Amino acid sequence: IPYPNKNGEPCGFGFRNGAFLQNIRKHILTQRNIRVIEGTVTHLIEEEDTIVGVNYKRKLAADEESLYAHLTVVTDGPLSKFREKLSKPVNKLNGYFLGLLLKNCELPFANHGHLIMGDHPPMVIYPVTSTSWRVLIDFKGEKPPRLGRDFKKFLLEEFEQAMPKSARAAFVAAVEEGKFKTFPNHRLPANPIKRQGAVLLGDALNMRHPLTGGGMSAAFNDVLRLSNNLEKIIDFSNLRQLGKAVQKFYETRHLGTQTTNILADGLYGVVYNPDLRKAFFEYVSRGDKYAEETCSILAGLNKDKKLLLNHFIAMARYGTQLKISAEKPGVVVTESLSMVKDAVGIITPLLLSEKPDPGNKLMLEALNRIV
């Protein structure tokens, strides 16, 4: 699926997340107006109802130290220990990704990500270097998969034949090598609490399923929107101005992340529904706007929630048309209606979690009760 060729041709990059972040840190270290202190924050310092700084401990140090600031930016990731002080989180664990590395192989589309769907858990494959590919396999449930010799056998039996032929030997080698990584997949709608002197952003505030790789796009959106608000403040000791900037960020950040969130969790629901999974594949296989506009939302290039909703419903409708035309109409009418109902059931709660306007909220709540 190509990126939309508008206003110049955009391109995507596959990379190791850890290496990418380390390179960002290297760049930060070169900036003269930034002082870097490495340590572990232990507490937020509170005076009355205002956060005025942090207590932290340097590596190998015995004693804690304190830092004070007019604004503390909390970005301690998916396992945030300060989340509950700055939001009302409703965190849902969807399952786990198992990661392994394919070496020295080719995939059907060089320099592209691949989503492998079928009668097995979904797999995501994307390049991380010129000679290696990261494979992520989804495992539902509240507990991570149990690793061991039997697990290797299970992986080969369940997924080897689902891999593209050109990558099967590399997949077998990666399984036998056994260098697996597991990490949890969360869904966490943003529900911040305004606290004077602090702001929460990134995965600490809001998470979606990583199936579409939208976490970094959402984090950069948070950074950009918060920065744009803060750069207008001349004096950070003016707590009223500072509070307004943070409040505006909380009120508008969803405009940059809502399509990323809805598509990620919506597609995760689709890939586990056999009828919708087939409908999605056939829909984007039509090419043209059916593929390009969908990809533009996936890549974070298009943030039009209405466009996303239109494509989602059109995909379900197209699936029903294919099912009815392929078989006797009387046999599949019930299944077709069920497909549309399933699609509405997937998308409605996601739309409700992204600050709909009052009129749409009433309609969505009514739909949610029906499905």
Question: Where would I find each of the regions flagged by the language model?
Answer:
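C-terminal helical "tail/cap" subdomain of flavin- and related membrane-associated enzymes
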Residues: N228-V371
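A generic "binding-loop/recognition-motif" signal
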Residues: T40-V41, P78, P121, T131, ...
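Conserved N-terminal helical subregion
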Residues: I1-K85, N91-G99
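Central beta-strand plus flanking loop segment that forms part of the substrate or channel wall
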Residues: P78-H112, W133, K140-K143, L155-P164
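FAD/FMN-dependent oxidoreductases across multiple families
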Residues: K143-Y250
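Active-site substrate-recognition segment that forms the wall
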Residues: G113-P144, Q161-A162, I193-K194
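Flavin-dependent oxidoreductases
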Residues: E84-L86, Y96-Y126, L147, S166-V175, ...
